[in-house]
C-alpha cells in the first residue's frame, strides 16, 4: 500500500468536491479546477474526506496511487489558499509591466517581449517593476507559467542578468583573467 496514497484527504470548509467518471472537480472560495485521473485509480468522496484507491497491484497503479492523492490535496489547498511564485528581474533597464492578461517585458532585446497569461493565472509587479508575483489555484499551471516566463531571459552566470525565481541562487562564474 502506498504510504501517501492510503491517507485520506480532509475536505476543508466551503469546498465542494465531486467525481464525475475519471474527472475530479474541486470548487472553493479562490476558484475552481478539475483534473483527470487514470482509470487504474478510483477516487471516492465520503464524510468530508477524499479517499484514493487503486484497482490492481501493478507497478504503474502503485505509482499513480500516491500521485493522485497528492494532486487532490494540491487542488484542495489551491482553491482555499491559492499558490504564488515570485520572480526577480535583474539587469540594467530590465523591467516588467502587467497590462490586462499580458505581461510586457523589456529584457535588453531590440523589441519588447509580450507574454500572454494562461486562463486562471494572474500576475502583479512591484513599484520598481523588477519583482513579479504570479498567482493561481492550480499548482501545476503556476509552475509551468513561471518556468516559461523565466525562459524568456534565463539568468546568465557572469553578471546574473535575466529572470530568476525569487528563491533561486545563481552560481556565478569568474570572468577571464588577463592575457599572459
Swiss-Prot record:
One of its GO terms (biological process) is cytoplasmic translation. It comes from the Bacteria. Transmembrane segments: none annotated. One of its GO terms (cellular component) is cytosolic large ribosomal subunit. Keywords: Ribonucleoprotein, Ribosomal protein, RNA-binding, rRNA-binding. Belongs to the universal ribosomal protein uL6 family. This is Large ribosomal subunit protein uL6. It comes from Anaeromyxobacter dehalogenans (strain 2CP-C).
Amino acid at each position: 500500500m502506498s504510504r501517501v496514497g492510503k491517507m485520506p484527504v480532509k475536505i476543508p470548509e466551503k469546498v465542494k468536491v465531486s467525481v464525475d467518471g475519471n474527472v475530479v472537480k474541486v470548487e472553493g472560495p479562490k476558484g475552481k479546477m478539475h483534473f483527470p485521473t487514470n482509470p487504474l485509480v478510483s477516487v471516492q468522496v465520503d464524510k468530508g474526506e477524499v479517499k484514493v484507491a487503486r484497482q490492481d497491484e501493478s507497478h504503474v497503479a502503485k505509482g499513480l496511487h500516491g500521485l493522485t492523492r497528492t494532486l487532490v490535496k494540491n487542488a484542495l489547498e489551491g482553491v482555499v489558499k491559492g499558490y504564488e511564485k515570485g520572480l526577480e528581474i535583474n539587469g540594467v533597464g530590465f523591467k516588467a509591466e502587467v497590462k490586462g492578461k499580458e505581461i510586457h517585458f523589456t529584457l535588453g532585446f531590440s523589441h519588447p517581449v509580450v507574454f500572454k497569461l494562461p486562463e486562471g493565472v494572474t500576475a502583479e509587479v512591484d513599484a520598481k517593476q523588477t519583482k513579479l508575483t504570479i498567482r493561481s489555484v492550480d499548482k501545476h499551471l503556476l509552475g509551468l507559467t513561471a518556468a516559461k516566463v523565466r525562459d524568456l531571459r534565463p539568468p546568465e552566470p557572469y553578471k546574473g542578468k535575466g529572470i530568476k525565481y525569487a528563491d533561486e541562487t545563481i552560481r556565478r562564474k569568474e570572468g577571464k583573467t588577463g592575457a599572459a
